[in-house]
Amino acid sequence: PQEIFVPKGTILIDRTVVDSGEEERERFIVTHECFHYLLHPRCFRKTDGMGQYCRKENFNPWGRERKQMTALEIIEYQANYCAAAFQMPRIAVRQAFVTSIKMKGIPEKPLRFERWINPHISKLAKAFGVNFNPMKYRLQQLNLIDNGKRI
């Protein structure tokens, strides 16, 4: 490894993360890292002797079941959530979803995540310049589709 010097505030992304040639993935990663820079500047400003305090605590993503998460898991969730909201704005995604599945309005409860909905997710992902999974998770965050788990 070679040591390099960059100006303060520079965001470095390992080339292997974006070498796949997937422009959508690269765009999401860059947006995710920019939100780390904005939301968590102290977490990534390392000085000698500075430790990372990490513990599990209750965190309630999207108002659903509680999950024990470490501080690192929480800040990753926050950066992912903000990147998704930035690239796939709520109002635009809702409108595009309703148009794609030919509904008259926003569903009162999430639609069941079933195979027939996959082409719609793919179409929306392409329209918003993201991959399938980030779009699927965004639709779940917005309560437009469920998570596919059956009781």
Give residue ranges: language-model regions.
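Active-site hotspot residues in diverse enzymes, especially metal/ion-binding acidic/histidine motifs
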Residues: 1-151
